[in-house]
């Protein structure tokens, strides 16, 4: 016997309403994540095109010009080509490690974007330990590279993975000490709070002027973490064929290619956040952006303006990184390790001690 009273109908309707609310909440949670991933992917495509154009200008040659207007779709064409290629596995390699390595590298870098504020309202997760979460997550990527090198059953790949791990350890410590100095100055480890602490005096309030030594060390260490020339020892073509990427093809090789540019973009964004005031207009004593928050249209205009300012500062450092790659020669492995352990580490530690002393004296 089925009882169908008004009370039972109300309970069923309420249950369906709760289920719809849960589905709506899940969809609403996924929308910003997917938007962030799509935006980052478009940004990487633009960076690849810019690098090809800038390198062509430096080398006095013609860059990509056939795939789309001015060759702007060349990176998309390369990605499509890699997607359609056969995915080969080494005959005597470790298949699980060989397959997990690229995924671990790209996912760890993607997670770093969750704590990056592109504007005051465009941040996926404003955490109290945002900058240190970025350091912790990004340090997982070299483990994926080491797994890829070991799983390839190739001496060149394994040497490339070992170099990636050694390089990451050498430059992660100075980079962390520089971030710790910024946290002491800002009295917070939140990326949003660090930007707000630089907003009072315009560009004179940037941490660049208060931490010039830390800025240089952070810039060098971030380039080394991205494995860009002159720090691309893990994939040196003349020595290791292609390093840990030697045995890869198809979409897995594309993962490494994407990871490199994801890492480059996130490093440039953190230079902007930690040292250049993030989304702030940087005009001393003048902040007219809050005036646009009279209505929703004004709020959208302010968010768009802050996003543009953040990306403009970021792409300035991307230009420096790209120019550095095509103008400086590669270091030897001993020179790279000596630079990290004998120079950057002591200087960054001294910078942290000076910052701590100045903060204690100002109390």
Curated annotation (Swiss-Prot):
GO BP field: aerobic respiration; photosynthesis, light reaction
Domain of life: Eukaryota
Pfam (any one): NADHdh
Catalyzed reaction equations: a plastoquinone + NADH + (n+1) H(+)(in) = a plastoquinol + NAD(+) + n H(+)(out); a plastoquinone + NADPH + (n+1) H(+)(in) = a plastoquinol + NADP(+) + n H(+)(out)
Subcellular location: Plastid, Chloroplast thylakoid membrane
UniProt keyword terms in alphabetical order: Chloroplast, Membrane, NAD, NADP, Plastid, Plastoquinone, Quinone, Thylakoid, Translocase, Transmembrane, Transmembrane helix
Root EC class: translocase
Molecular function via GO: NADH dehydrogenase activity; oxidoreductase activity, acting on NAD(P)H, quinone or similar compound as acceptor; quinone binding
Keyword Endoplasmic reticulum attributed: no
Transmembrane segments: 30-50, 98-118, 129-149, 165-185, 253-273, 303-323, 336-356
Record EC number: 7.1.1.-
Membrane topology: Multi-pass membrane protein
InterPro entries in alphabetical order: NADH_UbQ_OxRdtase_su1/FPO, NADH_UbQ_OxRdtase_su1_CS
GO cellular component terms given for this protein: chloroplast thylakoid membrane
Known partners and oligomeric status: NDH is composed of at least 16 different subunits, 5 of which are encoded in the nucleus.
Function in brief: NDH shuttles electrons from NAD(P)H:plastoquinone, via FMN and iron-sulfur (Fe-S) centers, to quinones in the photosynthetic chain and possibly in a chloroplast respiratory chain. The immediate electron acceptor for the enzyme in this species is believed to be plastoquinone. Couples the redox reaction to proton translocation, and thus conserves the redox energy in a proton gradient.
Name of the molecule in the record: NAD(P)H-quinone oxidoreductase subunit 1, chloroplastic
Native source organism of the sequence: Pelargonium hortorum (Common geranium)
Gene that specifies this protein: ndhA
């Amino acid at each position: 016997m089925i009882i169908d009273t008004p009370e039972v109908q109300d309970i069923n309707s309420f249950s369906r309403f709760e289920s719809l609310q849960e589905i709506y909440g899940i969809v609403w949670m996924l929308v910003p994540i997917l938007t962030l991933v799509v935006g980052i992917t478009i940004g990487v495509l633009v960076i690849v095109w810019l690098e090809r154009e800038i390198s062509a200008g430096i080398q006095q040659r013609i860059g990509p010009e056939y795939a789309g207007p001015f060759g702007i779709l060349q990176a998309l064409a390369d990605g499509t080509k890699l997607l359609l290629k056969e995915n080969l596995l080494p005959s005597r390699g470790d298949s699980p490690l060989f397959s997990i390595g690229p995924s671990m590298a790209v996912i760890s870098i993607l997670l770093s974007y969750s704590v990056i504020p592109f504007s005051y309202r465009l941040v996926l997760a404003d955490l109290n330990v945002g900058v240190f979460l970025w350091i912790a997550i990004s340090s997982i990527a070299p483990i994926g590279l080491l797994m890829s090198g070991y799983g390839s059953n190739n001496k060149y790949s394994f040497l490339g993975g070992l170099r990636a791990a050694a390089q990451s350890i050498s430059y992660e410590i100075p980079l962390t000490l520089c971030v710790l100095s910024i946290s002491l100055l800002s009295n917070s480890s939140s990326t949003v709070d660090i930007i707000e602490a630089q907003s009072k005096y315009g560009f004179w309030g940037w941490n660049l002027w208060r931490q010039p030594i830390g800025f240089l060390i952070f810039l060098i260490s971030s380039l080394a973490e991205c494995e860009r020339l002159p720090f691309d020892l893990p994939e040196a073509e003349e020595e290791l064929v292609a390093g840990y990427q030697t045995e890869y093809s198809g979409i897995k090789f594309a993962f490494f290619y994407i990871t490199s540019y994801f890492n480059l973009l996130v490093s440039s964004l953190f230079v902007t956040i930690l040292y250049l005031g993030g989304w702030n207009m940087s005009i001393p004593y003048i902040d007219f952006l809050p005036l646009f928050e009279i209505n929703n249209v004004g709020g959208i205009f302010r968010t768009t303006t802050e996003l543009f300012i953040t990306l403009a500062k970021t792409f300035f450092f991307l230009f420096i990184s790209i120019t550095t790659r095509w103008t400086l020669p590669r270091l030897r492995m001993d020179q790279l390790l000596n630079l990290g352990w004998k120079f950057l580490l002591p200087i960054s530690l001294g910078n942290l001690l000076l910052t701590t002393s100045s903060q204690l004296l100002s109390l």
